[in-house]
Amino acid sequence: MDTNYIIETKNLTKQYGSQKSVADLNIHVKRGRIYGLLGRNGAGKTTTMKMLLGLTKPTSGEVKIWGKSLQGNEKKLLPRIGSLIESPGFYPNLTGTENLRIFATLRGVPNNHAIKDALDLVGLPYKDKKLFSQYSLGMKQRLAIALAVMHDPELLILDEPINGLDPIGIAEVRSFIRELCDTRGKTISVSYTHLTLPT
């Protein structure tokens, strides 16, 4: 496998009983680009992303991140990755900022500037008294993305980040995904059910 790739898989396969969710998948992701993983519901997009993050063990095949096997190197590699796979477990009776502060403490994110920057990026207010339980679906999705980028990861893996967003929200998410790549040099892998990649 080539170490020039941030993500590389070789014959990646996940099988549940007799059903193959992912079969012999070979991915090559270069630095500083946006990659779209497109497919209908049930096509294996989420399973693939979970294997890239070590959340699901492959039946066979290999995952390399920054040229190193993910297996056995999770503690070194995963802190450099931000992800959104399913909804994070936010506390309903806390504000968005308070929720991010808890995650920041757990992850060792050093200061409140990281929280404010992440909220600014996704268009949520830093000083807001609205509780998470009062958030719309779109606001919840934005907070989840803010959590994914808060620790300034080099690589982002986002599973259908536009779920629940209205057309304006979709355009805004596409815009800041593009900004993360173009101005901050992030490498981003995004899954979509429909072709709505950043332009």
Which residue stretches match the model-derived regions?
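Single conserved hydrophobic/aromatic residue that forms the stacking wall/gate
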Residues: L197-T199
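ABC transporter nucleotide-binding domains
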Residues: N4-I7, K14-V190, L195
